[in-house]
């Protein structure tokens, strides 16, 4: 049985955690186990679940203290003598790959799961690190073509040296369930409302404040509409202030950070993701699997949509009113005939059970190449 050093950085609620955990839950753990390296300021480490599945959690200093972070990582790696390191930290992979090289780990996988945007404060650092992010890695992965090309370059991608493993979900857990939809809507008092939803970190990247602008325009056209927001982040207070400013507090359900996500996909009538950038977002696949019309910004790769009849891509240059009109049109078209899209999502290659077997095979082939 092979233990893989999985470098998570900050393990917060959201796409990266969901992606890696779905692969871990479904991979054959008699052949491969994951040791998770997480920054100590992570707020959503499922330690109990990981340990029940046979994995281990190592907490290291936050990457803001990069020398201490690398020193602690190095001590653990030397002790455990890994043969595979798999890092999910984008351009920050440079540092973990260097540690892996120092420790003599022969297989060092750098994975890209996101991109960048000029409006994001972190973009300057990402652009500085990007030319060096291939250093010390032996293998390259991405969860979509767009983020693979963004981090590793067209040449490496076109040469077939970047392996794409898609964002994956548990299609059964996230499938459409009308009974669950009705009970959730009853519980939250939204049985007779059009419900627009968003699940994610409340950050500049996710364009949280624009979501509020869109809903403010929408609720003027559809006064009974509700906005359901799940997540937390540095823009929480700014979001709540804007809701108050618009006078729409009674139309917004803000539930903070939650783990019981499937019931809320079922309760919604449309999902909003007007992000400044994404790799291949988990929430998009989950929402479409549950039969939700999905509104992406055009800054998000079109490969993020598994269902042509549900995925809509709109420019961020469009006004909130234009977004609102398109959303209401899609919702009214979909509501009478809503159905799950599990088979389409599976066929598009987003099912965790199938893709985890491919990841296992990839690891096994890399190990075999050492002999």
Residue ranges and their predicted role:
Residues 2, 6-18, 22-68, 234, ...:
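N-terminal strand-loop element at the rim of the active site
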Residues 14-22, 194, 198-217, 234-240:
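A conserved mid-protein helix/loop that constitutes part of the nucleotide-sugar donor-binding site
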Residues 87-95, 112:
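Short His-centered aromatic/hydrophobic patch
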Residues 137-175:
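A short, active-site helix/loop in glycosyltransferases that binds the activated sugar's phosphate group
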Residues 175-189:
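A short helix/loop element that forms part of the nucleotide-sugar donor recognition site in Leloir-type
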Residues 240-256:
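Nucleotide-activated donor-binding/catalytic signature segment of Leloir-type glycosyltransferases, i.e.
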Residues 257, 276:
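Aromatic "clamp/platform" in nucleotide-sugar-dependent glycosyltransferases that forms part
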